[in-house]
Amino acid sequence: MKILGIGVDIVENIRIHKSLKNVNFIKRVFSSSEILLAKKITNKKSFYSKRFAAKEAFSKAIGTGFRENLNFKDITVINDKLGKPSFVVTDKIKKIVKKRFKISSFNFFLSISDEKKYSVAYVILQKK
């Protein structure tokens, strides 16, 4: 197993909090499943900030940023029953990774954290 990419991003939570006042920002950046889940969450600022950082870190891990026809909504962050975060790997993401790295079998690993003013995400892309 080989590490193909690493991405990290830090977000100032207040910046995302201000952006949340713009409905177009939410619709442009977050998937419908993330928006639905956010409605059940008390601390929306933290929820959205951590996911924004995760999406940025993801784009850095694959080495393209938001190019190659990749946009924020293509990346959905989910949590398992214990709260461990991960990504929904869509066919579009598989295609981008396959084209960029010439592989078809891979894993993403995601770690997210926040502390008062900041949220941070760390992503590793690994060949299986």
Curated annotation (Swiss-Prot):
Uppermost EC category: transferase
Keywords, ordered alphabetically: Cytoplasm, Fatty acid biosynthesis, Fatty acid metabolism, Lipid biosynthesis, Lipid metabolism, Magnesium, Metal-binding, Transferase
Major location category of this protein: cytoplasm
Cofactor(s) recorded in Swiss-Prot or TrEMBL: Mg(2+)
GO cellular component: cytoplasm
Localisation: Cytoplasm
Binding annotation for Mg(2+): D9, E56
Catalytic reaction equation(s): apo-[ACP] + CoA = holo-[ACP] + adenosine 3',5'-bisphosphate + H(+)
GO biological process terms held by the UniProt record: fatty acid biosynthetic process
An example molecular function term from Gene Ontology annotations: holo-[acyl-carrier-protein] synthase activity
Record EC number: 2.7.8.7
Function, in words: Transfers the 4'-phosphopantetheine moiety from coenzyme A to a Ser of acyl-carrier-protein.
Family label: Belongs to the P-Pant transferase superfamily. AcpS family.
Alphabetical list of NCBIfam families matching this protein: acpS, pantethn_trn
Name of the featured protein: Holo-[acyl-carrier-protein] synthase
Protein's organism: Pelagibacter ubique (strain HTCC1062)
